[in-house]
Amino acid sequence: MSNANFSILVDFAAGGLVLASVLIVWRRDLRAIVRLLAWQGAALAAIPLLRGIRDNDRALIAVGIAVLALRALVLPWLLARAVGAEAAAQREATPLVNTASSLLITAGLTLTAFAITQPVVNLEPGVTINAVPAAFAVVLIALFVMTTRLHAVSQAAGFLMLDNGIAATAFLLTAGVPLIVELGASLDVLFAVIVIGVLTGRLRRIFGDADLDKLRELRD
C-alpha cells in the first residue's frame, strides 16, 4: 500500500470516528445509537488493520481483527440486547442539553481538541499523527455524552465512545498496541458493559424504567 493511499484511508477512518460521535450526539433513538457505535468500532479497527497491511505486520492485523470483533460486533450486540429488552423506551429521554446546543458544544469540543493537540502534530508530523486531533475529539465528545445523557444505555454508549477514542489515540500515536494489551482493555470494557446491562435490567424490573432522571425523582 502506498503512503498516499494509506494517508487517505487513515483520514477516512479518523473522520468516521468523529462523524459517528457527532451523530450519536444528534440521535435520540437508542437503536440508532447502538448501530452508530458499531460503525465507530469498525472505523477504529480500520486504523491498526491499515497499519498492519502497510507494514506487513501480522500482529497489528490480528489486533485490528480483534478490535473489529469486539468493538463492532460483540459490544454493540450486548447494548442492543439491553435496548431490545426495554420495549417501552426505545428513545432517550430529554437530555440535560437540547439537541441544537449539544451540536454546537460538540463543534466547540472538536475545535478545542484540534487546538490542544496541534503542538503534538507540529512536533512530529506524520500520516497517523495528523489524525490524532480527531481521536482526541472523540474522547471529549464522549465525556460530554456521559455527563448529559440520562438513560443508562446512553451513558454506556458514551463510555464505549470514550474507550474508542482512547484506543484510537493510542493506535495513532504509537506503532500499535500489543494484542494482549488491546484484548485486556477490551475485556475490561466488555465486563463493564455486561454489568451495565445487568443493572439496567434490574432497574427496569424493579422501577419500570432505566431513565436515571426518573429514578432520582423516585428517590426524592
Curated annotation (Swiss-Prot):
Keyword annotations: Cell membrane, Membrane, Transmembrane, Transmembrane helix
InterPro entries attached to this UniProt entry: HyfE-like
Domain of life, source organism: Bacteria
Localisation: Cell membrane
Membrane topology: Multi-pass membrane protein
Chief location: membrane
Membrane-traversing stretches: 6-26, 33-53, 59-79, 103-123, 126-146, 157-177, 179-199
Gene Ontology CC annotation, any one: plasma membrane
Signal peptide feature range: none
Miscellaneous note of the record: Was identified as a high-confidence drug target.
Protein name as it appears in the record: Uncharacterized protein Rv0085
